[in-house]
């Protein structure tokens, strides 16, 4: 009787062990399937499979990498809030300093992409002040440069990249963009002389039109006062001359801002499509 009981428990143990082994193989297959979907750029399918794995698997073996790849999938789909959520979960499930660093860096990159750059700067400072990552200062500075790019501070971006390498490709690009930008305040002040602000922003036709209207209404206003037509002079001066004079100032500043936007968008388009280095 005792031998029968022993055999029963031995068989039960073997069955349980076999069941666990099959389950482990099943989870490994599920993870590999999800990872393959991610590599094939089927991001939403990958997210579904990773989440299915995390729901059924009670261990921690797949938690870090699954959450990291879910975050990267959401990032590719421009679902930035969801991406940050899963990068944060990846950090919580990290087991090495390298994993902590990678997950935090991904959160920073997403903040750069969605232009919450102040948050990115705060996280970069936190990362830089962490003694565990003292040897990562150059890479941290690299992403700080990108944060300056996305906050439209091309001058500081150029300075930041040049700290890494004097003739860094991105330093040269950012410096070129910064030198090519118009100064909206200068355009505004130049427009005290009608048309000068437009000439500064290469809007020559607009500048000539502005000069023409201001000369015309200025002449008519002054002429009205000289002929003692005070009411006419006031009406022409306030309703027409002042309107065109103030419009000339506003237009010059607007042209500078619009052209700067075109230039920065063109630079960002180049960086996105033609720059071969690391990007957020």
Where are these regions (language model features)?
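Short solvent-exposed coil/turn linkers within tandem alpha-helical repeat scaffolds
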Residues: 54-63, 91-102, 128-137, 162-171, ...
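Alpha-helical segment of the N-proximal tetratricopeptide repeat
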Residues: 25-56, 76
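Hydrophobic alpha-helical membrane segments
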Residues: 65, 79, 99-102, 109, ...
């Amino acid at each position: 009787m005792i031998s029968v009981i022993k055999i029963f428990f031995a068989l039960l143990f073997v069955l349980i062990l076999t069941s666990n082994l099959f389950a482990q193989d099943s989870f490994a297959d599920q993870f590999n399937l999800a990872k393959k979907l991610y590599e094939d750029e089927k991001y939403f399918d990958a997210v579904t499979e990773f989440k299915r794995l995390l729901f059924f698997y009670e261990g921690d073996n797949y938690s870090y990498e699954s959450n990291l790849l879910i975050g990267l999938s959401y990032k590719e789909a421009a679902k930035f809030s969801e991406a940050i959520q899963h990068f944060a979960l990846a950090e919580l499930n990290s087991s090495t300093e390298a994993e902590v660093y990678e997950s935090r860096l991904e959160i920073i990159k997403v903040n750069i992409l969605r232009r919450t750059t102040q948050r990115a700067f705060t996280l970069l400072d936190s990362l830089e002040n962490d003694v565990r990552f003292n040897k990562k200062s150059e890479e941290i500075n690299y992403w700080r440069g990108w944060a300056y790019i996305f906050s439209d501070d091309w001058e500081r971006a150029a300075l930041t990249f040049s700290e890494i390498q004097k003739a860094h490709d991105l330093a040269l690009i950012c410096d070129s963009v910064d030198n090519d930008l118009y100064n909206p305040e200068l355009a505004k002040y130049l427009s005290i002389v009608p048309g000068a602000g437009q000439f500064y922003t290469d809007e020559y036709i607009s500048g000539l039109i502005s000069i023409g209207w201001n000369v015309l209404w200025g002449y008519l206003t002054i002429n009205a006062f000289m002929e003692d037509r005070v009411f006419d002079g006031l009406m022409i001066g306030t309703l027409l001359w002042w309107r065109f004079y103030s419009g000339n100032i506003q237009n010059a500043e607007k042209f500078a801002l619009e052209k700067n936007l075109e230039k920065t968008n063109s630079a960002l388009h180049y960086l996105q499509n033609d720059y071969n280095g690391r990007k957020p």
